Swiss-Prot record:
The keyword Ribosomal protein does not apply. It comes from the Eukaryota. It comes from Schizosaccharomyces pombe (strain 972 / ATCC 24843) (Fission yeast). Belongs to the NiCoT transporter (TC 2.A.52) family. One of its GO terms (cellular component) is endoplasmic reticulum membrane. This is High-affinity nickel transport protein nic1. The chain crosses the membrane at residues 38-58, 106-126, 141-161, 210-230, 238-258, 288-308, 333-353. InterPro entries: Ni/Co_transpt, Ni/Co_transpt_high_affinity. High-affinity nickel transporter responsible for nickel uptake. Required for urease biosynthesis. Keywords: Endoplasmic reticulum, Membrane, Nickel, Transmembrane, Transmembrane helix, Transport. It is found in: Endoplasmic reticulum membrane.
Amino acid sequence: MNSMSEYVKPRKNEFLRKFENFYFEIPFLSKLPPKVSVPIFSLISVNIVVWIVAAIVISLVNRSLFLSVLLSWTLGLRHALDADHITAIDNLTRRLLSTDKPMSTVGTWFSIGHSTVVLITCIVVAATSSKFADRWNNFQTIGGIIGTSVSMGLLLLLAIGNTVLLVRLSYWLWMYRKSGVTKDEGVTGFLARKMQRLFRLVDSPWKIYVLGFVFGLGFDTSTEVSLLGIATLQALKGTSIWAILLFPIVFLVGMCLVDTTDGALMYYAYSYSSGETNPYFSRLYYSIILTFVSVIAAFTIGIIQMLMLIISVHPMESTFWNGLNRLSDNYEIVGGCICGAFVLAGLFGISMHNYFKKKFTPPVQVGNDREDEVLEKNKELENVSKNSISVQISESEKVSYDTVDSKV
């Protein structure tokens, strides 16, 4: 047993070492840690494999299915940019980074859970399209209320929790500016403690998967792909259920690719700290900027979903409510705007980093330098005194030896 373990372990370390050497030799990858780039390129590889399999199936079954499959994949890419996806993934990533369980694959598990609803719905639709279509409106209404309620509640809770975190980060930056304190402590009020206990519930992949599944009960994604499946069954009589399953599968991998990229890049942005002489300030600085954008986005989308839930239960006619309906029909535009806001915030942070770094340099550093000089001088004096004492001791010993020799 021991000999085998001693043999396997060096092989494993050697493999990891070779992989790291190969990875960091690639110019455009060396700036990203493997924890960020590996999930993204893994999903790119999965998409390529799925499309190869889909091409084989389409060529064997019916080549006219290609456009429908391509449309399903495009719908997955588009739906991944929906505002509730982007906001939930970004806020969950930020919350997990403030714990001891940070994850760069929040978007992956969230989109897989979300797409599971699509897959189950398409199987039911493909098996019982004629009977299920008559009752589809009831399922859509009930699922819309459940999914929107859960999404709204989670986003508002995430917004409140990240607001608490934003206050805490601002307090730490103020303490650092005032006295140079770099310990992450200070805000330990009742609300902060309650929010920490609440968000500890979402601390593992399967819990994020469940959240994505519940979000999917809104049936917005299921409507697109399932109606596509019904239309395909109507147009292509005799198409097998296995061919119909291509639609939710390509939808899943397309949506998972975009959400994984978003989650991994936000993980990198939130955990970013420059390799400068002051990484503590850089970490606080970028965290405050991105957390502020996350709070604004979460509150905005949560309030919009609350208003959408009200109008779905009690329809109303006015310019405001009609505009809200048009906004809900173009949800991917809102998600794209949120992504753009994060990009602009990141560019602003990079461009203004040096300015704020100089402004927030704690004046206590000068005092510390003076204290260091005093300590060095004290050490020199102590060394001098020790040397003088040792010299005195050596001279006394020498004298004693001389006296002994004279007596002898």
